[in-house]
Amino acid sequence: MKTLLRTLLYLALIVWLGAEIFFPVVAAVTFTTLQPQTHIAGTIVGQLLRILHGMGLVSGMVALALLALGPAWGLYKPRSVLAPMALVIFMMAATVYSQFGIIPAMERDRMAAGGAIDTSDPTNPNTIDFNRLHNRSEHVELTILLMGLATVVLVARAESGKS
């Protein structure tokens, strides 16, 4: 039973981190393939990012539940799961911020700039703000990935509870 629960925890983290690692590859391929139609590529990537965030939040809830219950089930010592739990909470908070803060603001800026950022005036305040938010979004996703990798390391070295 302990092996199954640990496996589920690692699976939740793998799904989230795998998606975080794979997303930039998909985005790059999408923009390369649809180069003349960057608006369509951006729409596709935006939808994929929403899916990534949904997967991340579900994976985060599963990981958080397993980490919280791990000491009671004898998987880990109570103190050894505190840091991984905090990181998962921060990862989920960053995901929520990106999904419900950054993405809607980028969409508003895109629409206010005329619907297609690549054809809008680069000095337009909406275009400037869109690009600023896009840069922030990239940093948030990188932060989520790095916190996820740290979580994996901390979970891997977490002390086991009594058998």
Name each region found by the language model.
Residues 14-17, 87-103:
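Hydrophobic alpha-helical membrane-insertion segments
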Residues 35, 69, 98-101, 154-157:
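Helix-loop junctions at the membrane-solvent interface of multi-pass transporters
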Residues 25-26, 97, 101, 150:
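Transmembrane alpha-helix boundary/anchor motif
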Residues 70-89, 155-163:
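Cytoplasmic juxtamembrane regions at transmembrane-helix boundaries
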Residues 2-82, 107-131:
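Interfacial loop at the N-terminal end of multi-pass membrane proteins
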Residues 132-140:
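Individual transmembrane alpha-helix segments
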Residues 61-64, 141-160:
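Selective detector of the "anchor" transmembrane alpha-helix that sits immediately C-terminal
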